[in-house]
Amino acid sequence: YMKMKYFIIFLSFVISVPVVAQEKYSTKNGTIVFEASVPSFEEVKAKNENVSAILNVETGDFASLVLINGFRFKVALMEEHFNENYMESSKFPKAIVKGKLKDFSATKLSNGTSNYTLEGTITIHGVTKPFETSVSISKKGDSLSVESQFVLNPTDFNIEIPKIVSNK
């Protein structure tokens, strides 16, 4: 009952300024929500609130790491299938995004929201692919909020979805 022809991923991080190095913002409790739901079928949605991310505001370099088995589903059986059958999280425990924000400038980060393009790579299920997505960064006081939404195709990452499941 898990139709996963596409994952829709919502990335959301609130990154606070560390005391020592002002040029790097980081968090260990960012959030990723993914959805692979289809109308009229059971909701396939999960959330992970222990995502690590770092942004170097001098270079625009960005990196994020998520432990796959940290995704929480409403239905325990879905979580089990996700980890064991699809993502094989014991073999491929993490997903990583690394990249650079194009035309990023720390001086543009006044209170408010700025939009950038993140170019780099994404590694899921042991497969690394070129990756590009729109990112919005909002500054409020000493914190940055980094948000993005994108669609991934599981077959691009050698994630096999049985036909009986993907045809539902």
What do the predicted segments below correspond to?
Residues Y1-Y25:
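Bacterial Sec-dependent N-terminal signal peptides
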Residues A21-K168:
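Low-complexity, acidic/polar, glycine-enriched regions of mature
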